[in-house]
Curated annotation (Swiss-Prot):
One of its GO terms (biological process) is programmed cell death. Increases the activity of extracellular murein hydrolases possibly by mediating their export via hole formation. Inhibited by the antiholin-like proteins LrgAB. In an unstressed cell, the LrgAB products probably inhibit the function of the CidAB proteins. When a cell is stressed by the addition of antibiotics or by other factors in the environment, the CidAB proteins possibly oligomerize within the bacterial cell membrane, creating lesions that disrupt the proton motive force, which in turn results in loss of cell viability. It is found in: Cell membrane. The keyword Transmembrane helix applies. The chain crosses the membrane at residues 7-25, 30-49, 62-82, 92-114. It is a multi-pass membrane protein. Pfam families: LrgA. It comes from Staphylococcus aureus (strain N315). InterPro entries: Holin-like_CidA, LrgA/CidA. This is Holin-like protein CidA. The lineage of its organism: Bacteria, Bacillati, Bacillota, Bacilli, Bacillales. The keyword Transmembrane applies. Coiled coil: none annotated. HAMAP family: CidA.
């Protein structure tokens, strides 16, 4: 029964994140902002966390789950690129090198930022971050 509670908690936390992202998308549509709706949602999410309107405990496990499974979210992008590969007139080796390097940069920078935030968060709680 304990696993069921953890799954429900995770789904609720993911739901909160998805709703905030959806609200960001709607804000972008209404105000015709030159940013992607998901970026507006991310900024909104950041503000809600900063001003403690949404406590970190409400979304922490869901966010950690998304960070752990982030690599799977890049796969549809690569498959989509493969569908239009015949329309790409660039040097294929250069094109795929840029994709691989860009993906590595995003993954490494995301991991670095997440690690720094985790250490900072644990430091605030008074826990040794390297236990």
């Amino acid at each position: 029964m304990h696993k069921v509670q953890l799954i429900i908690k995770l789904l609720l936390q993911l739901g909160i994140i998805i709703v905030i992202t959806y609200i960001g998308t709607e804000i972008q549509k209404i105000f015709h902002l030159p940013l992607a709706g998901s970026i507006v949602g991310l900024f909104l999410f950041y503000l809600l966390l900063q001003f403690k309107i949404v406590p970190l405990t409400w979304v922490e496990d869901g966010a950690n789950f998304l960070l752990k499974t982030m690599v799977f979210f890049f796969i549809p992008s690569v498959v989509g690129i493969m569908d239009v590969a015949s329309e790409i007139t660039l040097n294929y080796i250069l094109f795929f090198a840029v994709i691989i390097i860009g993906t590595c940069i995003v993954a490494l920078s995301s991991g670095y930022i997440a690690e720094k935030m985790s250490v900072k968060h644990k430091h605030r709680k008074g826990v040794d971050a390297y236990e």
